[in-house]
């Protein structure tokens, strides 16, 4: 049962990750960015976790997902502002965004565990995270940014690599859920594999304007 849940969840995530780049490429940053955040990766991850977790553990895993998406929004803010403000290259922006995600995610993971251990309701905690995510997404998209369509196709090998990265992240999340690490599995299920590979693939194929134009709508769509 565990292996089946992992494989199905990972396969769905990999397929969606591949389609996201194509959506942004075809429809432009605004429409494609929102399409990229349709919850077709967290749904199979949630189904996989539900099938192998207790009710309490599943609630704990899901309660941290809005916080994880908020961390992803901050991750995307790095991609919007770091290249212009600090003149970072694609490599530098990638490293900085991952460091920011790891640092904030780690602090939030510890805080989430302690807050809910003290008796704070999982649903209320999740709704608090959702509220913060919506505010952050609105703030990031309040000022319109250029969101051009792509003019060059992303190479098939890049699509395969990004689909594989997303599949691995979701597979690990479901596996950790089976080991009774609900908070860790919930956070890992939101690891920005799709966002990261979208940014890298589109930057390489189209230049930095296309992925930066998509980042804001991705943040708001994640809510």
Model regions and ranges:
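Structural signature of hydrophobic alpha-helical transmembrane segments
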Residues: 1-14, 36, 56-74, 121-134, ...
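C-terminal transmembrane helix-loop-helix hairpin of multi-pass membrane proteins
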Residues: 4, 164, 175-191, 195-223
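C-terminal ends of transmembrane helices
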Residues: 16-29, 74-89, 139-151, 200-210
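Cytoplasmic-side transmembrane-helix entry/capping segments in multi-pass membrane proteins
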Residues: 30-40, 86-100, 123-130, 151-165, ...
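A generic, lipid-embedded transmembrane alpha helix
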Residues: 36-52, 103-106
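Membrane-interface helix-loop-helix junctions at boundaries between adjacent transmembrane segments
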Residues: 55-67, 74-127
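Hydrophobic core of alpha-helical transmembrane segments in multi-pass integral membrane proteins
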Residues: 102-104, 126-142
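Selected transmembrane alpha-helices and immediately adjacent juxtamembrane segments
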Residues: 143-183
């Amino acid at each position: 049962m565990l292996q089946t849940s992992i494989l199905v969840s990972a396969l769905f995530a990999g397929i969606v990750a591949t389609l996201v780049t194509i959506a942004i490429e075809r429809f432009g940053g605004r429409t494609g960015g929102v399409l990229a955040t349709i919850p077709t990766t967290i749904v199979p991850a949630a189904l996989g976790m539900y099938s192998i977790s207790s009710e309490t553990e599943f609630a704990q895993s899901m309660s941290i997902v809005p916080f994880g998406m908020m961390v992803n929004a901050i991750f995307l803010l790095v991609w919007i502002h770091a290249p212009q403000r600090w003149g970072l290259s694609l490599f530098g922006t990638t490293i900085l965004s991952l460091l920011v995600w790891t640092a904030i995610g780690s602090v939030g993971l510890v805080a989430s565990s302690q807050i809910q251990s003290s008796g704070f309701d999982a649903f209320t905690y999740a709704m608090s995270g959702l509220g913060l995510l919506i505010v952050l997404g609105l703030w990031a998209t309040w000022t319109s940014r250029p969101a051009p369509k792509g003019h060059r196709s992303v190479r098939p090998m890049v699509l395969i690599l990004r689909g594989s990265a997303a599949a691995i992240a979701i597979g690990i999340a479901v596996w950790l859920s089976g080991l009774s690490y609900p908070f860790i599995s919930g956070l890992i299920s939101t690891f920005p594999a799709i966002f990261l590979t979208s940014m890298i693939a589109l930057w390489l194929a189209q230049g930095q304007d296309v992925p930066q134009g998509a980042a804001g709508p991705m943040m708001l769509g994640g809510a």
